[in-house]
Every structure is written in structure tokens, then in C-alpha cells.
Amino acid sequence: MSSRNNNKLPSNLPQLQNLIKRDPPAYVEEFLQQYNHYKSNVEIFKLQPNKPSKELAELVMFMAQISHCYPEHLSNFPQELKDLLSYNHTVLDPDLRMTFCKALILLRNKNLINPSSLLELFFELLRCHDKLLRKTLYTHIVTDIKNINAKHKNNKVNIVLQNFMYTMLRDSNATAAKISLDVMIELYRRNIWNDAKTVNVITTACFSKVTKILVAALTFFLGKDEEEKQDSDSESEDEGPTARDLLVQYATGKKSSKNKKKLEKAMKVLTKHKKKKKPEVFNFSAIHLIHDPQDFAEKLLKQLESSKERFEVKMMLMNLISRLVGIHELFLFNFYPFVQRFLQPHQREVTKILLFAAQASHHLVPPEIIQSLLMTVANNFVTDKNSGEVMTVGINAIKEITARCPLAMTEELLQDLAQYKTHKDKNVMMSARTLIQLFRTLNPQMLQKKFRGKPTEASIEARVQEYGELDAKDYIPGAEILEVENEEENAEGDEDGWESASLSDEADSDGEWVDVHHSSDEEQKEISEKLNSMPLEERKAKAAAVSTSRVLSQEDFQKIRMAQMRKELDAAPGKAQKRKYIEIDSDEERRGELLSLRDIERLHKKPKSDKETRLATAMAGKTDRKEFVRKKTKMNPFSSSTNKEKKKQKNFMMMRYSHNVRSKNKRSFREKQLALRDALLKKRKRMK
């Protein structure tokens, strides 16, 4: 009887929904009956909107599921649903409100609602005190905007939504403003809204009174996102084999050295592939998209000076200001005295503050402003009353600041710091040596003669630029090396360059070996001698002639770069060579736009750990130590036991006639006889 009742269509909405989707015209009457029933429930709901209604929730989901089957009847259904939500969302029952939102999401997925109006409604619903609803709406907003811009950038919709989000960031409800900011950051991270307008809208959140919003915006610009969430949404993780697959494949296959090498090679390829797919720090490029970084930095500094936030938030503000000043080369002279207040060895997180001071230094800052900063660091850190680590950090900070603003260093201060080259502490000594090495390339004349080292070609050509001076060249420095290397080829070449090139191509295409020119030590020495014999002005003239007369290839630029690097090692004309010519790796590490904390905290000698630290490390190792038994760990803990394990636990009578037992090497008769004799002798001794 119950099964017959379940088959009645008016009371069984899932079955009716299934039949309508198969054949809509055949069930128009049943649909109209349910539609009228829905209307009457809506009228009842309007009288008491705060009352839960399970029947209305079922009817709303039913109408949303079949809305595409009867568009003429349900043309006003999406708008009615939006009106019900917008007028009553504060008093609605949470379950009914969630049902209405899910129905609207379903209608949006069927493209029956305009995205702009729906997303604006959902942003208003973020004010509701319903965490699950906010999470659902956040996911839908991000996914929907991603789908809107899937094929091409839909600027019309994007502009409307960005303007609306700009107003939402200034909303009085902190939760709604925070989620709006999270949406914009997530869309920027996914390269959907990666334009300047999005970035400049996010900059307004840096002046929010709400700490959570302020920290989220600062974190975005500083590139310190929270721990990467390894959700199932990440598409790149599902592609290709994982390390576990490779290990299982090796474990189940034949154990040989060849297969082991294959596994190692495959693991290397997998690691390389993962590194290639790993996205870069997504928000560092956002600093470059700010419209008016000078005004933005000034406002941030004003906020920092009057801020009453926690110390960590102040540190984030200082970090962002220093990055803005360093990257955009801004004039923010009040920032340096503000930082100087915190430059004390006992100051909390002082190494980071030194890093911010170095980041904010650049060649356009007047030297006298940076000089006071350098003197503060030198007086507070580089003194004999401090420990070796403190002095090392101070010298490292001075080195990084002067690398960006060389004119700030005075000759007197440099000579004082150079004296630490013979300090008893190895860390201080090595830091002083790196500072001396820096000024050997920047301005050797500031160093005492004994610290200048052997003069090289680069140090002879080095010239200190005055403040604000631009060194604009009309030639490529080092291009004269090409003329020397290609001099014989140019003399022997045909008048028609195109013809000679085609002839050489035909000769090379015969499949024979092609002579490749390798620069040996003798050839490099000969080239450098020829160049050294030329005056500096003649070198510049030849470099200008080469730069204007030919198009340089990538190989030519590589040769020029290597020649410029050789100048750092080759002795100056008339001086003895300090060491033999050594090969230079062309892929040397370049200095980036930002400093790392390691540049400030670099210690060449690891400090000794005290007794308490060593004891704590030893005790920590003992607590995690298991029994002294080697246990084979299974890759799958729920897998069945092996035949070898089962054999150990079997009854002997079951194993008695097995091949392993019968073919087992047993003792001979003589061995048994000797064993019996020894046993009897031993027993007789015990009896005595």
C-alpha cells in the first residue's frame, strides 16, 4: 500500500521532477498544480517569514530543477526568489535561507539569471550571521566569476562587480568587507582579475580600521599568504603520476640496478615538473600595478606613525613601505628617522628592521639622509662591547645599504669597518671582508691601499657617479671583444654577406663535422693583451662602431657578458696576474629586487649551542625513539599479510609435508651421534 502511495505524482516531487525532465509537455497539468501550490505557500510565508517551512523549501527546489522546462510559466520565478531573500534575509530561518540560495545558484548555473544582480544580492547576504551560508556564497562567487571570464575577459560584468566590491570594502559590516576582500585576492591569485584596478581597490583596504582586513591586505602585498591549502580543487595535482605511484611500480617490479636508476631518474623528472608548475609568489607583481605609489606610501607612513596596532602589524606596515620605496625609488625622507628609533641590538625583531632599512635605500635618496642611518647602525651594533653575532649583523646591514646607496658611505667610517678584517671572531672578520670586497668594485679609492687588493681591469675602469648622475652610454660596454674575435673572419668574408651565409649553410648541411671555436687560456690571454694595449677612448670608439654596424645575436651578448666578467679577475695592464684564468659559470645568481633576511643574518661560522640546548635536543630524540626492533612499514596499512608472515604462524602439522620442509638440509647420522655423546657427557658431569 505504501509503494502505491509513493507513486502518486502530486505527493512525490522527485518522481514528478524526473518525469517532467524527460517529457515536459506530457506533465503540464501536474506542474501547474504544484506551481499553484507553491504560490499559496509563498503567500503564507509572507505573513510569517521567520517561521520554518519544509514544504516551501521542497517546492522551491522543485521549481528550480524544472525551471528550464517551462520558461514561459517560470519567467518571474527567479526575481520572486531574489525579492523574498533581499526583503527577509535577516529574519529567515537559516535552513530555508540556505535552500533559497541553493535554488538561485542552480538557476544561475542554468543561465536563467543575470550574474550582476545575483552576485550583488549574494554580497549583501554576506552580512548574515551564518558561517555555512557565507562559505557557500564565497565559493559560488569565486567560481561564477571564474566561469564568466573563462573564454574571454567579460569587462562589462567585471567593471560592475569591481565597483560594487569597492563599496563593499567600506561597508560597516566587517565580516562582509573581509569576505569581499578575500574574493578579490582569490580572483587575483587565479589570474582572473589581475588588472591594476583590482590592485588599487585592494590598496584601500590597507587603511581599514578593522585589523583583520588590514592584515589581509598587507599580507597580499607582502606575498606572505597563509599556508598553501592542498585542496582537491587544484587541477595540477591530478595530472601525471605521483611519487607514490613510482615507488609502488618499483616495489612490485624486478629489483635490479637498472630499474633503480630508472626510478631515480623518474623521481628527478617528477620533482622538476612540480617545480615548473609551482606558481610564483602571486602578489609581488601587485606592487608594480599601484597607480600612485608615492601617495600610497605617504599615507601608510602617516598611519604607521599614529598606529596603535600590535607590533606584528606595525612590522608588516614597515615592510610594505620599505618595499614600495625600494622598488619604485620613492622619496620618503621621514621613514628613515622613524626606522632609526628601533635600531637597537635589544630591540625585538631587529634583524627584520635592518632588512627594511636596507630595502628602503636606493641611489636617488640624498646621501646625507642615509649617512645618519649608517652611523646609527655602526654606533649601536659595530662596537666591541657587543657580541660577535650583533657586530656581524650590523656590518651585513651596512654592506646591503651601501650596495644600494654607495655615496652614503664616508671614508672615515669605511676605514674603521675595514679594520675588523683581522678581528678574532670569524663571523665579524668575514663580514668585514665582504664589505671590503664590495668597495673594491664600487669605489676602490675610498679604501686604504693595503685593502684595495690587486687592481683588475674592472677596478681601473670603475668610476663613482655623483648624486643624480646618469651614466647613459651610446654603445654596448664590452662590444669591442667581438671585433677582436671576428677580425679575421670579417677580413676573409665575401662582400655579399647573404651569399657567404648561404654558402656556409650548404657546406654545413653535408653532414660533416663543424669546427666550433673554443676559447682556451692562451686565446683569452691573447685577446686581453690586444685590448689592454689599446687606450680606453679607442676601445669605446670600437665598441660604438660594433654596436651600430651589426645586429648582435644572443651568442654575441653572451660573449660580451663573459668578457665583462673576466675583467673582475684579469689583472690590470702592467700588473702581475693574481691567479690563472678560471672559467666563470654563466648562470651566476643575480641580485633581485628584494633582499632576504639571510643576507642580514648571514653567519659564516655556526655558533656553539649551550648545554641546555644540547640536552633538550637529546631528550627530544629519546621521546620519539621506538623499540630497538626493525619493523617493516607497509605502504598500505590495511593490506593483507604476506605468505612469509602466514608461514611463521601456521601449525607445524600443516607444514609437515610441504616441499620446503621435506627438502630441508638435515643433520647426518654422524652429526647426531656426536651431539648425543656430548649431551651424555654433559649430563654425567652435572650428576657428579
Swiss-Prot record:
Start and end residues of each stretch annotated as Disordered: 484-524, 605-688
GO biological process annotation, one example: ribosomal large subunit export from nucleus
SUPFAM superfamilies: ARM repeat
Biased composition (Acidic residues): 484-498
Pfam families assigned to the protein according to its UniProt record, in alphabetical order: SDA1_C, SDA1_dom, SDA1_HEAT
GO cellular component, one term: nucleolus
Keyword Transport: yes
Compartments (UniProt record): Nucleus, Nucleolus
Keyword annotations from UniProtKB, A to Z: Coiled coil, Nucleus, Phosphoprotein, Protein transport, Ribosome biogenesis, Transport
Residues in coiled coil: 254-318
Domain of life of the native organism: Eukaryota
Compositional bias of kind Basic and acidic residues: 514-524, 668-681
Residue positions, PTM Phosphoserine: S232, S234, S236, S586, S596
PANTHER family: HSDA/SDA1-RELATED (PTHR12730), PROTEIN SDA1 HOMOLOG (PTHR12730:SF0)
Family from the record: Belongs to the SDA1 family.
Reported function: Required for 60S pre-ribosomal subunits export to the cytoplasm.
Designated name of the protein: Protein SDA1 homolog
Species, as recorded: Bos taurus (Bovine)
Phylogenetic placement of the source organism: Eukaryota, Metazoa, Chordata, Craniata, Vertebrata
